Design a protein with these regions (language model features):
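Nucleotide/phosphate-binding catalytic cleft detector across ATP-hydrolyzing
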Residues: 1-173, 192-203, 235-322
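PRPP/pyrophosphate-binding module of the type I phosphoribosyltransferase fold
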Residues: 170-173, 178-180, 185-189
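Short, highly charged low-complexity linear segments
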Residues: 181, 185, 212-216, 318-322
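Glycine-rich phosphate-binding loop plus the immediately following alpha-helix
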Residues: 186-225, 229, 233
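A glycine-rich, aromatic-flanked flexible loop/lid motif
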Residues: 179-183, 229-236, 284
């Protein structure tokens, strides 16, 4: 039997969904050097691939920024396998993954990604260093590569039995997916895609602008803050130097500026939101900006925007595999 999986290997967070399980976690893998030590005696789950050991760690790295080269790297394959291991029940799996609009339009890239991921892979997992490791054989039979916002469309239109909900296939949509690296826009007439558009703006820009702003604010005090201090969540309250710093006002200003850039990108796409029945904001960025995005009469922020794409990808895989 082949297990169907929906997977979003984003630079910010991994989202993986199967029929009865799902997981969300920061996409940060750290390769172990052999000198790791913890006073508690554990460093967490260890993943071994191609004779190298890794742990999930907030100070680790993802497979890259905005370059399409990341999809064909060993790091991206490893991120995929670690994600699949969170939900795997069957040895054979079929995946749907999403890519930004601009990468989706690159000639032959979808085929190259599928060929890179498909095949038999071996991942070893242990609860800690030096503990007995378990072998996971992951045979990726099929890989479907789609544009990222399509996941939310599938999640909204189909229920878990893959039935169309309330004739939702008869309406027109604009899906605005605010991710870590990119914002991607999908316009449809029913289930037929009218237009896709992508822009290199995302929560990464909020983080970078935020860190620059608070360093400028605190420069006279010789305090210094990094992306690790604010974390992927862009915390308004930062704890460092034994103190608590409240940067709520600064963060809100940065977010408001980003939303203005977002509005400019939507206009640049040439998509008139008033011509569509429903505008759906999705992705982790939509949740992060829910206080700043001013919703029109036909606009909503998807209720579970962080997982919407991955859940829709699982439905897409299930439809394709029958």
């Amino acid at each position: 039997m082949t297990q169907k999986i929906g997977l979003e290997v984003a630079n910010g967070y991994i989202k993986v969904v199967s029929d009865d399980s799902e997981a969300v976690y920061p996409n940060r893998l750290k390769m172990l050097t052999g000198s790791e030590f913890s006073l508690t005696g554990t460093i967490g789950t260890v993943y071994e691939f191609n004779n190298k050991k890794y742990i999930l760690d907030e100070k680790g790295d993802s497979s890259g920024g905005r370059s399409a080269d990341r999809y064909l790297s060993e790091d991206y394959l490893l991120e995929t396998l670690v994600a699949v291991s969170q939900v795997i029940k069957e040895r054979n799996v079929a995946l749907t993954i999403g890519v930004p609009c601009r990468d989706f339009e690159v000639k032959d890239l979808k085929t190259k990604i599928a060929n890179h991921l498909k095949g038999r892979h071996v991942l070893y997992i242990s609860n800690n260093l030096e503990e007995e490791k378990e072998e996971y054989i992951i045979n990726i039979e099929d890989v479907y590569v789609v544009v990222e916002p399509l996941g939310t469309l599938c999640e909204f239109v189909f229920n878990d039995k893959l039935q169309i909900v309330n004739n939702r296939d008869n309406f027109s949509y604009v899906i605005i997916d605010i991710g870590y690296s990119t914002t991607d826009i999908l316009a449809t007439n029913g289930l037929r895609i009218d237009k896709i558009f992508g822009e290199d703006i995302g929560c990464m820009d909020i983080s970078n602008d935020y860190v620059r702003a608070i360093n400028k604010l605190q420069g006279d005090n010789r305090y210094s803050f990094t992306l690790d201090d604010v974390t992927l969540e862009n915390k308004a309250i930062v704890e460092k130097y034994g103190e608590k710093f409240d940067f709520t006002d600064t963060l809100n200003e940065i977010k408001a500026t980003f939303v203005r850039r977002l509005d400019t990108s939507i206009k640049k796409s040439g998509i008139n939101k008033n011509n569509y029945d429903r505008i759906i904001y999705t992705g982790g960025g939509a949740l992060a900006l829910k206080e700043q995005i001013k919703l029109g009469h036909n606009e909503v922020i998807y209720c579970d925007a962080q997982l919407a794409n991955a859940r829709g990808f699982w439905k897409f895989t299930s439809i394709k595999k029958g």
